[in-house]
Amino acid sequence: MIKKVVAYAAIAASVMGASAAAAPQAMAIGDDSGPVSANGNGASQYFGNSMTTGNMSPQMALIQGSFNKPCIAVSDIPVSVIGLVPIQDLNVLGDDMNQQCAENSTQAKRDGALAHLLEDVSILSSNGEGGKG
């Protein structure tokens, strides 16, 4: 009984290994085209701004109709969590991303400038690319 279980486990492991070996490999190549996106092309927005009239009606003219899309841009504040020793994550290979109050837009994560150091060395960057480039 135990021999059959071990044999079935070995067969299952070999099938999984063969399928993983046959899967296409992810290759990093020098692709300078970058991400492509289209956001909000031809979009329009309408708001149901209400108005109250009459005697003793609450007229909040400061907020009424003007607070439909509030945007309070607050940047990253480098505050030390541990105390006197500031610990910070330095993003060396990627770009610093900071997008605030941008409607119908995309902030795409791309490779930073330091990630492209070996891009033009063909033996390192485009190995296995198949002659494209």
From Swiss-Prot:
**What triggers expression?**
During aerial hyphae formation.
Annotated signal sequence range: 1-28
Effect of gene knockout:
A single rdlB mutant does not form the rodlet layer on spores; disruption can be complemented by rdlB from S.tendae or S.griseus but not by any rdlA. Decreased levels of rdlA mRNA. A double rdlA-rdlB deletion shows no effect on spore germination, growth rates, differentiation of aerial hyphae into spores or surface hydrophobicity on a number of media, but spore surface rodlets are missing and cells adhere less strongly to a polysytrene surface. In the double rdlA-rdlB mutant chaplin proteins are still correctly localized to the cell wall of aerial hyphae.
Q: Where is this region: Required for amyloid formation?
A: 45-70
Arranged from A to Z, the UniProt key words for this protein are: Amyloid, Cell adhesion, Cell wall, Secreted, Signal
A single Gene Ontology CC term: extracellular region
Keyword Transmembrane found: no
Q: Segment Amyloid-forming: which positions?
A: 45-57, 59-70
Q: What does this protein do?
A: Forms part of the rodlet layer on the spore surface; despite their high similarity both RdlA and RdlB are required for rodlet formation. Plays a role in cell adhesion to polystyrene plates. Forms amyloid-like fibrils in vitro composed of stacked beta-sheets.
Q: Which family does it belong to?
A: Belongs to the rodlin family.
Protein name per Swiss-Prot or TrEMBL:
Rodlin protein RdlB
Provenance organism: Streptomyces coelicolor (strain ATCC BAA-471 / A3(2) / M145)
Gene that produces this protein: rdlB
